[in-house]
Amino acid sequence: METGITIFVNGENRSAKSGASVADLLRELGLDSGRVAIERNLEILPRPQWAQTLVASGDRYEIVQFVGGG
């Protein structure tokens, strides 16, 4: 049975599934993983660690999306 946990994304309170990875979180948020950078608890989280890093209750994420243009 999966339980919900509370995390913060860009300063907002959100629910996440217990046992979800950061990559799962991005998919749930509908974000293109190729165009974002993630800070977890005040530290940059390298892209190769996204699939192995599990979200934990109380985690604070800042997710920045890159936008192209001219």
Predicted regions and their residues:
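Ubiquitin-like/PB1-type beta-grasp interaction modules and other compact soluble beta-rich domains
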Residues: M1-G69
